[in-house]
């Protein structure tokens, strides 16, 4: 078979990668390396900011570092909304993914230079690059399959496995380079300042993204028919004279795109270099973004003339949005409060050998690989008796709350000295089970309940909940101090919020189910 014929074959005929389209291999490894770069930097970022200057860090307090981390983490999940919009209208998902990867790589390499201007610039570049790559590479995975292709769900499972492989390996490697005393001694022997070990960790993240870009370029012929530039079209007729790669020409959209990019970068940059502004933004950003999202959903729904049932389903999605934000507020303490807890209050030794605190960031990804098939099998076994989406959400919140009760107890034990890392492993176990109950269900609900014309918008709302959760998580980390009583109180408060939210959602779950179930749908059916 010639290359041309291979590229024009129906997607259902392409089974070159473990029974899936060969393009999945290209996207699998690209995402694996991109997540390697993200989780590698994430594992050491908060630690770098709060480590003493004498040992290579910035020497900031948790209160000073938290707003910077919060703004960065929120941007990583907010900017994909803009990146997806740009790709849909101008450059296509394929080009957006490549551009995003290049910007991410440059961001990590910029962080590798031990200067304050490069620190801020690197964070901005990584956030902007992620905005271009994150949503678009997932969209291309979906485009590899025809609508009714039964391999689609399995394909996404393989794709997400790549995410977790990258998430598992990155903290181990980048964390070793950043924190290991033997590596510090080795680079000192090579003539480097041992305090630059943190920047070797950042550079390693950049190398990971670089490897992802190399194999993305090599494998581009495998994704020739997905993620291309949108073609110019009228309401009913496509201009056949338009070139396949010609982007839509709309000066209004271009102006809006430029304004949005400049505004986003300006806000992130100014907030980054002004910690006072970051604090102020924390009290303005969340209400503003939530209100804007609600207004956007309402305006879109009004323009699309939604039915009464559509509005009910949108109400359900906004309820799930609220509880999703609360969940991620707790879950994303992993990179902030829990990371600081691991660094300052945990005895990170195995048989006398001390391992970097950042290594504990690998636990979640490892547990997902182990337990995702088990949780999926439980839902399959229950069949039509499995709990509703709202109840699964409440279970996710409950498990996250239990995790915080565990870490609160562990914090109370630190009055007598450092505690075993197994406490954090147990916390991550509960949080992982909670994530598996909530995250897949939330994403599926957005596509299942949203009106057809609003699916992209509601997927954006889902990522917005993760963005806001990250922001709140970062701000809570600003309260971290190595004091048993203070930490116990903070963790108990978060546990109370999570468990309270779980109970509330469980109580109203019958009402939520009735909102998105029409009389015809009340007949029991096998779950999709």
Predicted regions and their residues:
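Short amphipathic helix-loop junctions that connect adjacent transmembrane helices
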Residues: 43-66, 179, 334-358
């Amino acid at each position: 078979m010639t290359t041309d014929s291979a590229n024009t074959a129906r997607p259902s005929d392409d089974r070159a990668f473990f029974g899936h389209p060969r393009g999945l291999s290209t996207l699998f490894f690209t995402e694996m390396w991109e997540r390697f770069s993200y989780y590698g930097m994430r594992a050491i970022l908060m630690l770098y900011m709060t480590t003493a200057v004498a040992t290579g860090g910035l020497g900031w307090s948790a209160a000073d570092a938290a707003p910077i981390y919060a703004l960065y983490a929120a941007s990583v999940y907010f900017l994909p909304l803009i990146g997806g919009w740009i790709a849909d209208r101008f450059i296509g998902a394929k080009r957006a993914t490549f551009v995003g990867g290049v910007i991410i790589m440059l961001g990590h390499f910029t962080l590798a230079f031990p200067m304050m201007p490069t620190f801020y610039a690197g964070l901005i570049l990584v956030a902007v690059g992620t905005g271009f790559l994150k949503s678009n590479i997932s969209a291309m995975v979906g485009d590899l399959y025809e609508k009714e292709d039964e391999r689609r769900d399995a394909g996404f499972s393989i794709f997400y496995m790549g995410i977790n492989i990258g998430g598992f390996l990155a903290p181990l490697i980048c964390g070793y380079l950043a924190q290991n005393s033997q590596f510090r001694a080795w680079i000192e022997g090579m003539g480097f300042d041992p305090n630059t070990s943190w920047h070797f960790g950042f550079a390693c993240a950049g190398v990971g993204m670089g490897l992802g870009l190399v194999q993305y370029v090599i494998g581009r012929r495998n994704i020739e028919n997905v993620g291309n530039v949108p073609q110019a079209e009228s309401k009913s007729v496509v201009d056949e004279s338009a070139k396949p790669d010609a982007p839509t020409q709309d000066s209004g959209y271009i102006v809006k795109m430029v304004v949005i990019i400049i505004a986003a970068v300006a806000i992130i940059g100014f907030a980054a270099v002004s910690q006072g502004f970051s604090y102020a933004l924390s009290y303005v950003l969340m209400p503003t973004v939530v209100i804007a999202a609600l207004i956007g959903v309402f305006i879109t729904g009004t323009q699309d003339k939604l039915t009464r049932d559509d509005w009910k389903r949108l109400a359900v999605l906004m309820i799930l949005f609220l509880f999703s934000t609360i969940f991620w507020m707790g879950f994303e303490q992993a990179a902030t409060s829990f990371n600081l807890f691991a660094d300052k209050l945990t005895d990170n030794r195995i048989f006398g050998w001390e391992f970097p605190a950042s290594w504990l960031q690998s636990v979640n990804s490892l547990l997902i690989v182990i337990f995702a098939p088990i949780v999926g099998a439980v839902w399959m076994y229950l069949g039509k008796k499995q709990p509703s989406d709202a109840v699964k959400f409440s279970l996710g919140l409950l498990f996250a709350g239990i995790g915080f009760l565990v870490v609160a107890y562990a914090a109370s034990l630190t009055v007598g000295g450092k505690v075993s890392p197994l406490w954090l492993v147990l916390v991550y176990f509960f949080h992982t089970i909670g994530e598996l109950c909530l995250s897949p269900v939330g994403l599926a609900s957005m596509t299942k309940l949203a009106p057809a014309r609003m699916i992209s918008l509601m997927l954006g709302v889902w990522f917005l909940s993760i963005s806001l959760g990250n922001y709140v998580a970062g701000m809570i980390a600003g309260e971290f101090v190595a004091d048993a009583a203070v930490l116990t109180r903070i963790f108990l408060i978060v546990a109370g919020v999570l468990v309270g939210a779980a109970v509330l959602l469980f109580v109203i779950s019958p009402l939520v189910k009735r909102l998105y179930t029409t009389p015809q749908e009340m007949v029991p059916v096998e779950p999709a």
